[in-house]
Amino acid sequence: MAKKALIQRELKRQKCVAQFAEKRKALKQAIKEASSLQEKLNLHRKLQQLPRNSSAVRLHNRCRVTGRPKGYFRDFGLSRHVLREMAHDCVLPGVTKSSF
């Protein structure tokens, strides 16, 4: 299980991304539409002044149960270990173990 501080940090980043998403999107669009170089530089400076954690690139997918960052399945939001356990316990609807 991941440290609780790491999980909380990731949740804080998600909130920050959601909070600044519209502002960041508007600034990026304005940079694309800007005609002069000076205007682009000013808009880029404004974009850089936003918090670093407001960028979606800094988000990392983590398992909802354990907080594990690796082996993450997007369809379920779980790591491979938890996915396997839940599939064996028939907790996940529609998931069956394959047999050849």
Swiss-Prot record:
Quaternary context: Part of the 30S ribosomal subunit.
InterPro entries: Ribosomal_uS14, Ribosomal_uS14_bac/plastid, Ribosomal_uS14_CS
The UniProt record lists the keyword Ribosomal protein: yes
Gene Ontology annotations for the cellular component aspect, listed alphabetically: chloroplast; small ribosomal subunit
Any one of the GO BP annotations: translation
Gene source species: Oltmannsiellopsis viridis
NCBIfam families listed in its UniProt record: PRK08881.1
Gene Ontology MF term list: rRNA binding; structural constituent of ribosome
SUPFAM superfamilies hit by this protein: Glucocorticoid receptor-like (DNA-binding domain)
Intracellular or extracellular location(s): Plastid, Chloroplast
Name of the gene encoding the protein in the UniProt record: rps14
The protein's name: Small ribosomal subunit protein uS14c
Family classification: Belongs to the universal ribosomal protein uS14 family.
Record keywords, A-Z: Chloroplast, Plastid, Ribonucleoprotein, Ribosomal protein, RNA-binding, rRNA-binding
Main localization of the protein described in the UniProt heading: plastid
Summary of the function given for this chain in its UniProt record: Binds 16S rRNA, required for the assembly of 30S particles.
